[in-house]
């Protein structure tokens, strides 16, 4: 009988220990351990890879931090746009709410975005728009972005397909494909991108999901190549370094490691 009581006490102690262990795993990991998407601590790809919540995450596996709106706070957004001059048209155009509203129309993005991805995205937004100063490409209207050989998305007479929005959407084939995806006639009305902030952010997100997100796991440098490959391999080292600088800054603000392969 005494043996049975002792065994029972030991069993209860063990259960208590494992209960506390599980609590710590969901997710109070030591600083050198990753918290996996399922709430457990470890160091290999199962913990530090896709879905990683905290710790030294790798690739796209960075802390989610919750919804898009909880990551892109008003303070985070203001820290960027407040660096634009008072005379900037974009300062009266781009808003944090228009970004969040646009992001929520892309559930695959909104439901899986990570802090590192937000840092990546806003580093490029910052570079492309001058801290959200510019809505349209400087002198863009004087440039020809019509690829006449593209018969799937033919250019409309008198319309310009120069860079607009946070990712500076350019060329008729991008306006056409993007508009088709979003249910908008951007071939005939490309100016919508420069007149409606939610549409502007939606075009940026469309380009992101199709051309940038697929290479996120390769590091920040691969995203530079996806957006403007002409800057890579010494094409424009100043621009590359500027993008990396913004990225490092935003990773710091959001509390995530920038990861490897930052340059291109």
UniProtKB/Swiss-Prot annotation:
Glycan attachment positions: 261
A cellular component annotation (GO) from this entry: secretory vesicle
Gene Ontology BP annotations: cell wall macromolecule catabolic process; chitin catabolic process; defense response; polysaccharide catabolic process
Catalytic activity: Random endo-hydrolysis of N-acetyl-beta-D-glucosaminide (1->4)-beta-linkages in chitin and chitodextrins
Keywords: Carbohydrate metabolism, Chitin degradation, Chitin-binding, Disulfide bond, Glycoprotein, Glycosidase, Hydrolase, Plant defense, Polysaccharide degradation, Signal
Cystine connections: 27-35, 29-41, 34-48, 52-57
SMART domains in UniProt: ChtBD1
Active-site residues, Swiss-Prot/TrEMBL: 128 (proton donor)
Presence of the UniProt keyword Signal in the record: yes
Renumbered residue ranges of the record's region Catalytic: 66-264
SUPFAM superfamilies found in the cross-reference section: Lysozyme-like, Plant lectins/antimicrobial peptides
Keyword Flavoprotein tagged: no
Top-rank taxon, per record: Eukaryota
Residue ranges occupied by any Chitin-binding type-1 domain in the UniProt entry: 25-59
GO molecular function, one term: chitin binding
EC number, UniProt record: 3.2.1.14
Signal peptide residues on this chain, from the entry's feature table: 1-24
PANTHER family noted in UniProt: CHITINASE FAMILY PROTEIN, CHITINASE-RELATED
Family classification: Belongs to the glycosyl hydrolase 19 family. Chitinase class I subfamily.
Protein name: Endochitinase At2g43590
Organism: Arabidopsis thaliana
